[in-house]
Amino acid sequence: MELDDFDPEDKEILSWDINDMKLPQNVKKTDWFQEWPDSYVKHIYSSDDRSAQRHLSSWAMRNTNNHNSRILKKSCLGVVVCSRDCSTEEGRKIYLRPAICDKARQKQQRKSCPNCNGPLKLIPCRGHGGFPVTNFWRHDGRFIFFQSKGEHDHPRPETKLEAEARRAMKKVHMASASSSLRMKGRPEMKGLPGEIPSQGSLPLTWSFQEGVQLPSGYSTPLIANAPQQNSLNDCLSFPKSYDLGGTTELEDPTSTLDPTKLYERYKFSSSKVYSAEDQFQPPVPGVYGDYDEAQTWNKNAVLGRSPTDDTYYPPYPLPVASWPCDYLPSQSSLEHSPQQVPLEPPAAQPGHHPLWTNPGGEPYEEKVPVDFSSYVPSVTYHSPQQDPFLLAYGSHPQQQYALPGKSNRWDFDEEMACMGLDHFNNEMLLNLCSLK
């Protein structure tokens, strides 16, 4: 159908050119937006069309210089294909969208094919007389005029949405691959069978002879008790507190000293006390917070032996595994080592333990004010198995400790309860070892 057959208004609509000074404005019907415009075509879009406002096209177009500022000119870049002409699993060919920038496009050609890792190549567009196909855009009044010159001589590249989706999938694959490589490069550290655990993972326990150099005179009683103490340590480890009722947070300042210096200081202070004919009160071997609940372990019937039986006790007054003791500071300002309050030395009774009374003697008339239910020592010293304080008592194995005076004697029932609790704790530890 020729132009002469149309009305003058229709002829004006069909015969317009993008470079005309005046474009038709009596357009009654606008066109639908075309995503793949090809060949020599013209379209009139509404100014409200969002795609026309953005000058979109599925062809890879870039802006080119134009002497007319009212007209936007775009040229086709062609398509990037695989030099091996490979296909995906779905049977599609690899037609990538060329980059807009010249340097980015040159860099893109040096990359490998995303499907077969083959080299890529660019197929330029030569559909307009040996030149790229050109698109023209012009805004005039209520319409947007579009005109294409030339016919594309190459396959259609992937759209922008498809290119963005492909890049996103590539990033996801790269992230998963890098994470898997990191997992393989840093496997979990697992302990080998029979491997000794590190010291940081072991509980805090006191070894039997940890850093203490003992004189030859003290080796015999300690070595005799070493197997028993080691077996107790193997069965039950205490976190630096030997009170079964709970850990004690208070600690004596002298516990931070070097063991050798601590031993020498205590040896010196003990020698001064012995020279003044004052003797230490032996520590109570079982001071617990739950003393009221342990009254059932009192009396001789529970122990099953007489209080004057010396075969059960060691030749020195303190056992190796002693419990926390209350040490009061010395009244002399020149002495800084913890000492116990000395008592008046009465007449010595050979053949009897210093904690027990003379058989047939009078009962004790006064009691030492000691509250076992709320025992909070002013200065509490945690005595481990290798405590140098214990060694000072062993320095006088031949000396017999005298009975305490009547003015400061312990009540017989309280002493029996303390000794019964000590015996009960030893039996409980042995039972735990046998169960383990």
From Swiss-Prot:
Keyword check for Zinc: yes
PTM entry text: Polyubiquitinated in the presence of UBE2D2 and FBXW2 (in vitro).
Binding annotation for Zn(2+) 2: C82, C86, C113, C116
Pfam families with a match to the protein in the record: GCM (PF03615)
Cell location: Nucleus
Any coiled-coil regions, as ranges: none
Residues at which Zn(2+) 1 binds: C76, C125, H152, H154
Keyword Transcription regulation: yes
Chief localization: nucleus
Keyword terms: Developmental protein, DNA-binding, Metal-binding, Nucleus, Transcription, Transcription regulation, Ubl conjugation, Zinc
Endpoints of the signal sequence: none
Any GO BP: branching involved in labyrinthine layer morphogenesis
Molecular function, one GO term: zinc ion binding
DNA-binding region of this protein: 14-169
Source taxon at top rank: Eukaryota
GO CC terms of this entry: nucleus; transcription regulator complex
Disulphide bond pairs: none
InterPro entries associated with the record: GCM (IPR039791), GCM_dom_sf (IPR036115), GCM_large (IPR043020), GCM_small (IPR043021), Tscrpt_reg_GCM (IPR003902)
Function: Transcription factor involved in the control of expression of placental growth factor (PGF) and other placenta-specific genes. Binds to the trophoblast-specific element 2 (TSE2) of the aromatase gene enhancer. Binds to the SYDE1 promoter. Has a central role in mediating the differentiation of trophoblast cells along both the villous and extravillous pathways in placental development.
Protein name (record): Chorion-specific transcription factor GCMa
